[in-house]
A protein has these predicted regions:
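Divalent metal-cofactor coordination and adjacent catalytic microenvironments
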Residues: 1-164
Length: 164
């Protein structure tokens, strides 16, 4: 099974401009690296709180099965543009929570693509992301060992412990 998730870096919360304001940067010379730091900080926060924080385009390619659990889905994400192809042909489907039931006859291979949207990221989560991205900017070498304490404290109320 192949799973791919491409983050829409231009719709992140907080934005690149928020990070530049936080760091008091007024020119565009650091934008490329700041975007990498911001994306990394968002993913770090996602891992800490077990919640999707980034608008994304997702794709799954796998052998046929009539029921697929969509990765990266959670209670705060909204799903749009879901498309299911079985052996290259579009299929109808039914969404049940984060599971997709495929209608029609069995096939060999299937591909599922969808967009995940995040409507709202709380202010304290955004602040934690800004602090983490700022730490990446301040320490471009591999010296930062852990999350900044302030970031940990801001994310702690949102941490969800999941069992698998």
């Amino acid at each position: 099974m192949m799973q791919r998730r491409d983050i829409d870096i231009y719709r992140l919360q907080p934005t690149l401009q928020d990070l530049k304001d936080h760091l008091r940067i007024t020119d565009d010379s650091h934008d490329r690296m700041l975007m990498i730091y911001l994306s990394s900080a968002v993913l770090q926060a996602e891992h800490v709180i077990s919640r999707n924080l980034a608008p994304s385009i997702c794709q799954i390619e796998t052998d046929y099965t009539s029921l697929v659990t969509l990765p990266y889905m959670d209670d705060t994400s909204s799903l749009t543009d879901l498309e299911v192809l079985v052996d290259g042909e579009r299929r109808t489907w039914t969404l049940i929570g984060s599971d997709v039931r495929i209608d029609g006859p069995e096939g060999q291979k299937m591909s599922i693509s969808y967009h995940l949207d995040v409507a709202f990221v709380e202010a304290d989560i955004q602040q934690a992301i800004l602090l983490m991205a700022a730490q990446h900017f301040s320490n471009p070498l591999d010296r930062a060992q852990t999350l900044p304490t302030a970031s940990e404290n801001l994310l702690a109320p949102y941490r969800q412990w999941k069992t698998r």
